[in-house]
Amino acid sequence: MTATLAALGITPEALAANGVKLGVKLGDATPFSFDALIERARTMAGQPYTPPATAPADILAKIDYEAHGKIKFDTAHALFADGPGQFPVTFFHLGTFFRAPVRMHVVEKGAAREVIYDASYFDMPADSPARKLPDGTKPGSGFAGFRFQESRLGDQKKLDWKKNDWVAFLGASYFRAIGELYQYGLSARGIALDVAQAGKPEEFPNFTHVWFDTPADNRADSVTIYTLLDGPSITGAYRFVMHRTKGVVMDIDTAIFLRKDIDRFGIAPATSMYWFSETAKGTATDWRPEVHDSDGLALWTGSGERIWRPLNDPPRTMASAFGDNNPRGFGLLQRDRDFNNYQDGVHYERRPSLWVEPLEGWGEGAVQLIEIPTDDEIHDNIVAMWVPKAPARAGSQYRLRYRLHWLADEPYPTPLARCVATRLGNGGQPGQPRPHGVRKFMVEFKGGRWRSCRLV
């Protein structure tokens, strides 16, 4: 191993020095590259799935919502807290709702070293059940996820980096980012498998390993990570290049390999929450006028057509498909930015929009929208994703490149007016008999060339 590292231009002394600077314990160095990670995922796809080892279930059960909330990562142990790069990394702890450990690594000059879990990285009560979890590299030990904190550099600070983060990976293959309004909201996933598919349970593969590229430049506004995806039906290797600029922009390069057939194979999925809005409140009993992280699905088709589909809380699970060929983009957007329309201190008016931009042709398929009934804001009940027309069968391989924009609005807005609200009511005229089965739609447009239109 020493000879291999020497060939890479890395000395054991330099790696040890980095371990001290990083503030965490690091394991032995091993060669790493994205190409090798892709081959690892390819090899795994030809082998039976092995579930990851987890910590003792009785201990995890005691780290419930309340106990988990008392466990805070000590920023003195943050990766890159003193550089290189602008953005330190902190970690989430395991618990009842996040049982699968994720193995974290630091990469420098082609060599990776694992970040060894230690309870001392976290501030927790003396009687916390988390203190009984195994340390080091024992089966079931590890972290649940991670966050990139805001810039540590004085002239770049948007907010105190020790208290504020801008991207988080936590649970299965879920991740999310704040937009330009400094607020978390909807989430993305590495992949979506058989969402709301009749007769089949949805599968949630995990990002089991993460590698953090050591930044080369203190002034860089981007970070690079690599992840390994593993599940009963799938494996995958992902590279994320994430830019902290106006909002957050992520360039994603992934290679995916299927172990089993998938009936609804969702690429670049976005997951959100919609309960009610001005469109229809239904039977929701709530003092607020609107409750949602997103209010519509926007599409820019391969032929250049713009489509806006308001979201709905349906009486039963609904699936809508918008057929297309080489789509230019789609996303779940939050267009209503008026606090008065929400009246809530959690600031739904600041939730980010998420736009998916393919960076190459995706061929034929459909943007599918899944809407699931909900009676509370705590449930994510909306999924939007690209589903290829060709069947996803065992042995299939996919190489995909796309960009995610976490902004207040879509990155390529139409010059025309856009729909910002849709209201439904009974048809007919006030004071007159209402015709049966007739609905009235009031659609509100804003901006663009609308002001120059004449009403006739």
Residue ranges and their predicted role:
Residues 1-17:
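N-terminal export signals
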Residues 19-65, 74, 341, 347-456:
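Terminal accessory/anchoring regions of large secretory-pathway or extracellular enzymes
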Residues 42-198:
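Solvent-exposed N-terminal domain segments of exported/luminal and surface proteins
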Residues 66, 164-173, 177-180, 263, ...:
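A contiguous, surface-exposed recognition patch within enzymatic or periplasmic domains that forms
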Residues 105, 226-228, 241, 253-257, ...:
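Residue-level recognition of well-ordered beta-strand positions that form the cores
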Residues 185-243, 360-375, 379:
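Extended, loop-rich substrate-binding clefts of extracytoplasmic carbohydrate-active enzymes
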Residues 227-273:
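Acidic, contiguous internal or C-terminal segments within carbohydrate-active enzymes
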